[in-house]
Amino acid sequence: GNVLAFRILPGVDVLEQRWGAARKIFEENPQLNIIGVEFVGYDSFKANTVVSDYLAKFGTIDAVWMDAGGTAVTILEAFKDAGAPYPKVMVGEDQQDYLAYWKENNLTAIAPTFPTFQWRTAVLSAVMFLEGETVQRNWYLPQPDVTAENLDQYENPEMPPLHYALCGCEDMTNYPDAWKTPDINKYVDVP
C-alpha cells in the first residue's frame, strides 16, 4: 500500500531514531510503497497541503507514518476535507487532540510515545547531584505505546488538545486542574 511519511525536524535525536527504525521496516517490506517523505515542521497548513498534493498525485494513501504527532489531526482532517477515506493505518503521538480524533473516528492507529515526563529526569538528577546524592548512570524510562486496547486509559476529554497523555505530571501539585485551565497571564517577561 501507499505510505506517506511525515517528518517534523531533521537532527532531533528521538525523531532520527524513529525514522531510522521506520526506514529499516520500510526497506524490509517491499509491499510498502513509500510515496513520499516530507518535512513539515509543526506547520498545519503545510501538512494539509502535502496530503492534498499526494492524494491528487496517487489517488490513495493507505497509511501515514509520523516521527512526531503535532500535525496528526490536521493530516486526518485533510483526508476528510478531500472526501478521501482515512488511512488504513495511522501513526501519531499521545496528544489529546489526536487520541480524541482517533477514538471518535474509530481509526486503526497507534501512538508510540516519547513521554514528556522525561524532561523531569534531567532536573531530578541535577537536584540529586547538587544535594550530594549519587546519581545513577542509566535511567530506564517507560515508553508505552497507545493502542486501541489501552486508548481509553490515555484519552482524557477534560484535558486541553495539546496535552500529552504521558506528561508525567500526575503527581504534581494542582494536577489536573492547573493543566485544564492554565493561567497564561502569570508568565510575563521580566525586564
What are these regions (language model features)?
Residues 1, 62, 108-109:
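Conserved acidic residues
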Residues 1, 17, 46-48, 94-99, ...:
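Hydrophobic alpha-helical segments within soluble ligand-binding/sensing domains
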Residues 2-5, 25-44:
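Short beta-strand elements in bilobed, periplasmic/extracellular small-molecule ligand-binding domains
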Residues 5-6, 37, 104-116:
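Short beta-strand elements at the ligand-binding edges of bilobed clamshell
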Residues 6, 119-191:
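Hinge/cleft segment of the Venus flytrap/periplasmic-binding protein
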Residues 12-15, 40, 44, 65-68, ...:
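Solvent-exposed, acidic/flexible segments
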Residues 13-23:
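Short, surface-exposed alpha-helical segments at coil->helix boundaries
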Residues 21-22, 36, 40-101:
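Hydrophobic alpha-helical
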